Amino acid sequence: LFISFEALAEERSTRILVTATEEATLSSEISAKIISIPVKAGNNFSKSDILIEFDCSFFEAQKDVVQAELDSARVTLKSNQELAAMRSIGEYEVQLSQIAVDRAQSELNIAELNTDRCIIRAPYDGVMSKVFVNEYESIERQQPLIEIIGSGTLEAKLMISSKWLSWLSEGYPLSIVIDENGLEYSAQIHALGADIDPVSQTIDATAQFDKNYKTLLPGMSGTATFLSLIHIS
């Protein structure tokens, strides 16, 4: 059996795409007007930094009203408890007063949740990839606002021949040359897909880079070459 080195090298190479392990499109949970977008596209941010702030005057006013209702319900409950102790009213009135307090407290919890939603904070360290809206723009609930990318470990997505499964497994080393900068990076197979495409006879795989290379960016592409020789019988 004669196999050229060129054929062997071609069989062990495949295209890859660099992706971020943390990437998200953030949407609004409320309908409101944007008053601030502190982090612009391309800028870095830290976990818990404010990414978008909404005009919260309506929700703050709602919370104040509910807080006043809760305070009033608590006063009524206390008064009825004192009257019940003197047997001026029955236990039924006290129970109704307690129900009113519980209801007002639940409404206050909802109001506070709405005010908390007036600020979108960064879930992790990263960079602002895209901004789909502008300051002073009114947006609707569930409307996509921004796209963020985490600054954590990057990975490479690739498709491999299903025939490679006879020798390829998790932890297998590979070398990746990136098209955009011509640099070579070391990585290893991190995960293999759960099923094989019946048409192309390929399977998805994920490779993790051996360290956090500063010259790598999500969206870069390149060629992966597996370092070890293929065993052929």
Language-model segment annotations:
Residues 2-31, 190-191, 220:
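N-terminal beta-strand block that forms a small beta-sandwich/beta-barrel module immediately after a flexible targeting
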Residues 151, 170-186, 214:
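Low-complexity, intrinsically disordered
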Residues 58-113, 131, 156, 200, ...:
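Alpha-helical coiled-coil segments
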Residues 17, 31, 35-38, 44-50, ...:
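Surface-exposed patches in structured soluble domains
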Residues 55-64, 152, 157, 183-187:
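Short, Lys/Arg- and Gly-enriched loop/turn segments at beta-strand edges
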Residues 129-130, 184-230:
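Structural microfeature recognizing short secondary-structure transition sites
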Residues 10-13, 121-122, 178-186:
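Short coil-to-beta-strand transition motifs
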Residues 115-118:
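A conserved signal-transducing helical linker
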